[in-house]
């Protein structure tokens, strides 16, 4: 659109292999259209750090500038440094900085590097003005340099020129510093030279003169990308948790053998998607491994997506045990260089199997033959920041475009995938029994209205007795509570005030380990006030319960037990709740597998596919809050979560049991979990969704608006809704605009406009019209296609 964008000339073409081939570009274009996102943002989301070319503005010394830097008093011209007429010798700190850096420095780094040297160029604005004056005086030149960050990283080396070509005698007698640097360079191995960054700043300042004299040569050399990470990209502890090297593959069960035959038969015959529904412990991973082995034998690549790779080290270990170095793990916790190395090894065809989380759907696997999405129901596959794509749906589309086979695995498939199977879009395969002789554990429901928890509000008598018996028998227990922190509410007993985040419409959570109040939405931390902020009385009390408090109470109730906790805090979470996965997680998993933990307290992190053979009891503490979230998927999510955590019990040699304590034993999800009745739950839930017009019987898009001014955001949401309806007409159903269930986050008011239709085209057109309205200052609008959260 020429009225909005001014085209610019192409200044350079970056050489080398494109990051995306035609097939992947086609997928990216489809996704950009479907999710109504800029193509560039989508491509950026699919590239690892370091896999992009960029233009860098460089400031370089001219010959005159070098002379001025070396000899400030040598009669060089004078220029104003402060912009108001004051003069100084041209040999100022900026010229000296450029000289010491070898003659050039990126523009963006100059102010930072000068900050410690003082003078008028220590700020970005002053540095920019000063660069302009130096450029006008002919002392520096400024230009853009296109850097191909996709090329291997380089390092500057200096080596001595051949001694028979030039002699050090050309150096002035007083150039002792240059002679010393020359001797240092000549002392280095002739075939290797000396790394420039190993020299001091004063030594580097001599290189330009030595180069001009022909005594040394400076060159950029590529650094070989380390294959570290190819063998242990999930960390040594993780590898120890899951790998069972040298172990013979188990004999498949009848159900596994049937599934393997069906999928292998489809390999090489074009696109197909299988929904592999298997109860927890049924051996879905073994099916993946055997199908991938067949694909690799045929020269086809494989891609495996998991909800969160840091939470499933056992899967990575099993793949390495079976396929060795043919596996590249794309993990957000990897150092950028290792992640980039894995990406490039895939692109070069050095490895043929990629294993990773959501963004690994873009991995450059050659000749893709099979694509696996493990735990396909998990909401983590939906991106909630940036481009809101769904990893599972992108995987199916990628398989379709590659003529590959997609396998979606789950014990509790999403209703969308189950509906696709019913309509014949996916081929449905069942693994109804566990791969071991053990059956699914029985589930006991404790009605807390009849059996209230003890004085601490934690364990009912039946669950407390079961934990004690399990300890006495030397067996392991998992206690599941999907809320972290110590107390979920800090309330004043005098006036009723609940301490809330100043930026978000949510209460602060008390974390005893930090002795701080933390907002789990924006990351704000505060000290705990001694007095109520409203009535100024010392009546604040910590109410509610999170995993941190459960851990403390369990340690008090069972002092001889070895207790551990697994949630985003213990796994190394930042204040805002974004996990920086580290060694503690893997250490907990290792200790559980080694039998060194008696009771593990955790959030949904304990449900993510872990295979703890010693766990014979799972206790679910408070599932009630999740049942009543303002989300049409609330029942489905509760059932999936409870069925997954129940599946952690009885996976080893001894039978397991599950105890769920709840105030709502008649809730459909609880009733279904009691008998592991996925089919009954799905039938009832699909009937309810069809009657109410919810997915999978309709498509949805939500326009999310936020901004600092509530009235402005409300008005813009109304305008977006009106624009959407004017285009969608009667074929699109409108709900809203309305405040979001959490109406304020990070100081920004939030409104939502929900659009629904059984037809994609009018829904997409309505969403585009709504998102095109003119917004007020600092109002942001995000289009979320196929939203997975109503909050």
List each language-model region with its residue ranges.
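Inter-lobe coupling/hinge segments of SF2-like helicase ATPases
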Residues: 248-253, 257-261, 269-714, 718, ...
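A short linear hydrophobic-aromatic micro-motif
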Residues: 731-737
